[in-house]
UniProtKB/Swiss-Prot annotation:
GO terms for molecular function: DNA binding. The keyword DNA-binding applies. Belongs to the bZIP family. It comes from Fusarium pseudograminearum (strain CS3096) (Wheat and barley crown-rot fungus). This is Probable transcription factor FPSE_09188. The two putative transcription factors FPSE_09188 and FPSE_09189 could be responsible for orchestrating expression of the W493 A and B biosynthesis cluster genes. W493 A and B consist of six amino acid residues D-allo-thr, L-Ala, D-Ala, L-Gln, D-Tyr, and L-Val/L-Ile linked to a 3-hydroxy-4-methyltetradecanoic acid polyketide chain.
């Protein structure tokens, strides 16, 4: 069996022992190149038997070069630099892998509280590792806004700008691009948000022009009211915008109001109404039909505001003249009498229908008549003598009527 031959350089033919792969016997390489060639020539006559090599002595038979066989395996002379390699991986110093701090302006955590970088480096030299630790310490001490501003590939660069806008109470137009928030009103007048409509009337430009119906007089009246109101508002608006420091402007304002009222009265007359009151009554009667909300509002007004109105009229009548006050009081008395008699009739009808009711005796009727005659000295008592419907009223109910009247 012919053995393979190998060509090995002279630098590798050093007298150095090579450990066996199995660790049983060291193998000594040949030191003479001619000897190796001779052995190679002698090795051509070898058979397939395995031969041993003594430790410390050169091998008698070896292939061409520095290769030898030990335990059936071919051994080679390897330099010392290749026998114990020290593999070190260096990371580029310009590309430092670190975890950026959180995006918090007030983040002042210590180095020990932060987590380690998620990108570890293998076999980093001491100088590079120290540089990384210094950079991490610097990144932990500075605010996150400065760190993010110095990172070129970070997608958000407006940290300092946002902080400045927060300090300026969001007055920067780039934060709120809407002109309705940042810009001023300009030449437009400020909106009227107060309840006082007499001092600052609303602009008539926002009102829609009403549609006039020729067949319905109320619709014509509504259109006339809108037209007159528009003219009046326009005159009031002009008077408000104009300087009112002189008396001439005040007179012009009064003339404008009178012109507006005259136009309203002409429109009321053209619509077929006798007066402005009748037009207003017709307007509210027509508007209240089918409007449940307005009907409920009218009920509440009768229950709450009508008594207040009557009380105000009664107090205001104290300052009127005698004849003016007398007519007003007579009308109130007549209305009160009608209300009382209506209530008494309902009461008597209820007593007649009751099974325990007793007819009114003659004595009770005479007592009631006598009680009425005692009040003849009163100048207003003649008003009660003219009514003969009280003869059939019992004495106790008649007393109730007199107490209510006086």
């Amino acid at each position: 069996m012919e053995l393979p031959t190998y060509a090995v350089s002279q630098s590798l033919l050093a007298s150095r022992s090579v450990s066996s792969p199995r660790g049983d016997q060291p193998v000594r390489a040949a030191t003479n190149g001619t000897q190796g060639q001779g052995q190679g020539q002698d090795g051509q006559n070898l058979t397939g038997k395995r031969k041993r090599t003594n430790p410390g002595y050169p091998s008698r038979e070896s292939p061409k070069g520095s290769s030898s066989r030990c335990n059936g395996l071919t051994q080679y002379a390897v330099p010392a630099s290749f026998q114990s390699p020290q593999i070190v991986q260096y990371s580029p110093p310009n590309q430092i892998l670190r975890t950026p701090p959180s995006n918090d302006v007030d983040d002042q955590l210590s180095v020990n509280s932060r987590s380690e970088p998620v990108y570890p480096t293998l076999g980093v030299p001491g100088a590079v590792r120290q540089t990384q630790e210094q950079l991490q310490l610097h990144a932990a001490r500075i605010p996150a806004s400065h760190f993010l501003n110095n990172v070129p590939n970070f997608g958000y660069h407006s940290t300092d700008k946002d902080v400045a806008m927060k300090q300026n109470y969001f007055s920067d137009s780039t934060f709120f691009p809407s002109p309705a928030i940042t810009d001023t009103w300009g030449e437009l007048p400020a909106p009227d948000l107060s309840w006082e409509t007499t001092t600052r009337p609303h602009s008539p430009g926002n009102r829609a022009t009403p549609t006039v119906d020729k067949h319905v007089s109320v619709s014509a009246f509504e259109a006339a009211l809108e037209t007159g109101e528009l003219a009046s508002d326009r005159s009031i608006q002009n008077a408000y915008n104009a300087p009112s420091t002189t008396g001439d402007n005040h007179l012009e304002t009064l003339v404008s109001i009178q012109d507006g009222l005259s136009q309203v009265l002409k429109a009321v007359e053209a619509a077929g109404f006798d007066s402005l009151d009748s037009a207003v009554i017709a307007y509210y009667q027509r508007s209240s039909k089918g409007n449940e909300w307005l009907r409920q509002e009218q009920r509440l007004n009768r229950m709450r505001r009508l008594p207040v109105l009557l009380k105000e009229l009664h107090l205001a009548a104290q300052g009127w003249g005698q004849w003016e006050r007398r007519n007003f009081q007579e009308q109130i008395i007549k209305s009160t009498e009608d209300i009382l008699f209506a209530e008494l009739q309902d009461h008597l009808a209820t007593r007649r229908n009751s099974p325990h009711a007793s007819p009114c005796s003659i004595e009770q009727r005479s007592q009631a008549r006598q009680h009425m005659m005692e009040h003849d000295a009163d100048p207003e008592a003649e008003f009660y003598d003219t009514s003969h419907g009280t003869e059939g009223i019992p004495a106790d109910e008649m007393l109730h009527v007199n107490l209510l009247l006086y």
